[in-house]
């Protein structure tokens, strides 16, 4: 085995040492999740400074591309090498990327920094879950995973709020500088307090021999395949028509590389980046389906609910973040409640179904938003959706750790987190295309004199008001709201489809031996 099962119990800790390590992991996860959304508010100031409007899309996609592309590689690294040192290296890369972004003298340097930060971030959340697996007994892990899931949700929704505060009060560069002291605290705690015994294989063969088990061919094929599909979805229908040769070539290349990667995984067997016996294990496969769709639904809502507040209710990004607190609180409460109850009962499988059902009902309610909806309704709808997501957000990782031997937990955990991120990345791009297309169509159908649909689409969630004559504003808001509801319907469909994975989860208990 790659990880010595006999050493698992010896690495469990408790008391103040455990709390400090968990707190440091929460801080690291907070920074990683914050980076997904914090920049959205700062982009106008960045473009004012660098004068590169065409680079706006890359500020987010550079981070997202590398975050997704390196997920599975980190799973293999955590399986082969010291969890402590792999995590610290990932954190260091993330910090270097954040520093480059903070001091960036040009738009190109900022994009490079975002890409480097993404490489580091792809190993941090997985590393936090793997660390919990090492230091906490299986029966007690759900509540700690719930805390990590809750923190990720808090940071994702709070990003625009903090980004607005930094941009308005100091400088947009603090959107990145904030990661440095927080990451530094995490690094110090992990460096001095975390002690995980070396795996039997690492003690026997050494680091150089273990490097041969990294499946370099699989990584070389897999990484560009993910970049190709994400670029195709990022550009398709926005920068280039779907029929454009560039988009078609990217999709074809993605398909060829993905098929090649699967063949390599089959041939490599246990040495593969994702061994087939891990990916095909019933709970792992079903959890992957579940988290793909819950990730898709959640990220679509995280990005577009604040846009609804800004566009329809004419709120600032900061106020939109404040009004999204119902979603934050519900998500956090759901994650902690499900983790605590699972700790008590041992059963995690019911939460998959509960999450899918409540999340779907909440998403359905969000598709009922109107321009003049009452505050009590949108607060209740956001809370219902948020608690549904919270119930299931971390359950995939719990299921994987319950059914896989410790040697395969890092790979299974990385797979789950990769699929969850991929679902969010893919459907956020799909939602963007649907929103832009439907908004332009809705505005064109109004046939209002002097109204330029393309200009309004490009003006953003608040800037469009300056392009609309007051007497036409009510009609434009209805058209804008309808386009956003089409996006919410994408999240609703994904929420409903998550049940396909939920019903297949094996009914096991974290209180039983694997």
Curated annotation (Swiss-Prot):
> What gene does this protein come from?
aflT
Residues of this chain annotated as glycosylated in UniProt = 343
Knockout mutant characteristics: Does not affect aflatoxin secretion.
> Which membrane topology describes this protein?
Multi-pass membrane protein
What protein name does the entry list?
Efflux pump aflT
Output the lineage of the source organism: Eukaryota, Fungi, Dikarya, Ascomycota, Pezizomycotina
Segments passing through the bilayer: 13-33, 61-81, 85-105, 116-136, 146-166, 174-194, 218-238, 247-267, 289-309, 321-341, 351-371, 378-398, 411-431, 485-505
Q: What induces it?
A: Expression is not regulated by the aflatoxin pathway aflR activator or aflS coactivator but by the fadA-dependent signaling pathway.
* Gene3D superfamilies membership: MFS general substrate transporter like domains, Multidrug resistance protein D
- Presence of keyword Transport: yes
Entries under PANTHER family matching the protein: MAJOR FACILITATOR SUPERFAMILY, MFS AFLATOXIN EFFLUX PUMP
Could you tell me which species this protein originates from? Aspergillus parasiticus (strain ATCC 56775 / NRRL 5862 / SRRC 143 / SU-1)
To which protein family does this belong? Belongs to the major facilitator superfamily. TCR/Tet family.
User: What is one Pfam family matched by this protein?
Assistant: MFS_1
GO CC annotations, alphabetized? plasma membrane
Question: What's the domain of life for this entry?
Answer: Eukaryota
Q: Which residues form the signal peptide?
A: none
Using the UniProt record, give the first listed, main subcellular location: membrane
């Amino acid at each position: 085995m790659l990880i010595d099962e006999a050493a698992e119990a010896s690495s469990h800790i408790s008391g103040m040492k455990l709390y400090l390590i968990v707190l440091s992991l929460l801080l690291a996860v907070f920074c990683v999740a914050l980076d997904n959304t914090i920049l959205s508010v700062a982009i106008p100031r960045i473009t004012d400074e660098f004068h590169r409007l065409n680079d706006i899309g890359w500020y987010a996609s550079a981070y997202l591309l590398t975050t997704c592309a390196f997920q599975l590689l980190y799973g293999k690294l955590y399986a082969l090498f010291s969890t402590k040192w792999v995590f610290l290296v990932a954190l260091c890369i993330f910090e270097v990327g954040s520093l480059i972004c903070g001091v960036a003298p040009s738009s190109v340097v900022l994009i490079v920094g975002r890409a480097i930060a993404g490489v580091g971030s792809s190993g941090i959340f997985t590393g936090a879950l793997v660390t919990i697996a090492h230091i906490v007994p299986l029966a007690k892990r759900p509540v700690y995973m719930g805390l990590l899931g809750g923190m990720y949700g808090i940071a994702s929704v709070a990003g625009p709020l903090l980004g607005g505060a930094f941009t308005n009060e100091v400088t947009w560069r603090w959107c990145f500088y904030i990661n440095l002291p927080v990451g530094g605290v995490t690094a110090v705690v992990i460096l001095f307090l975390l002690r995980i015994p070396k795996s039997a294989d690492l003690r026997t063969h050494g680091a150089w021999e273990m490097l041969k088990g990294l499946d370099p061919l699989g990584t070389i094929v897999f990484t560009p395949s993910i970049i190709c599909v994400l670029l195709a979805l990022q550009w398709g229908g926005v920068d280039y028509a779907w029929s454009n040769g560039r988009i078609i070539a990217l999709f074809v290349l993605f398909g060829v590389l993905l098929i090649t990667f699967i063949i390599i995984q089959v041939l490599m067997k246990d040495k593969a980046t994702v061994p087939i016996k891990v990916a095909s294990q019933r709970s792992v496969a079903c959890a992957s389906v579940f988290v793909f769709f819950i990730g898709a639904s959640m990220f679509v809502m995280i990005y577009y609910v604040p846009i609804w507040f800004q566009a329809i209710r004419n709120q600032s990004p900061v106020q939109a973040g404040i009004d999204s607190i119902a979603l934050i609180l519900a998500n956090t409460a759901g994650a902690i409640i499900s983790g605590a109850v699972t700790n008590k009962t041992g059963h995690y499988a019911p939460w998959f179904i509960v999450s899918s059902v409540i999340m779907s009902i909440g998403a359905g309610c969000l598709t009922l938003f109107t321009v003049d909806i009452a505050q009590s309704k949108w607060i209740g709808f956001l809370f219902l959706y948020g608690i549904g997501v919270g119930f299931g957000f971390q359950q995939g990782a719990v299921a994987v750790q319950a059914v896989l031997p410790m040697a395969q937990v890092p790979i299974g955990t990385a797979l789950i987190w990769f699929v969850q991120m991929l679902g969010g990345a893919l459907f956020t791009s799909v939602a963007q295309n649907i929103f832009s297309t439907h908004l332009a169509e809705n505005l064109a159908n109004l046939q209002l004199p002097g109204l330029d649909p393309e200009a309004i689409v490009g003006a953003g969630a608040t800037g469009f008001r300056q392009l609309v004559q007051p007497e036409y504003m009510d009609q434009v808001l209805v058209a804008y709201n309808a386009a956003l509801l089409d996006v919410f319907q994408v999240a609703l469909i994904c929420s409903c489809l998550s049940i396909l994975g939920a019903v297949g989860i094996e009914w096991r208990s974290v209180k039983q031996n694997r």
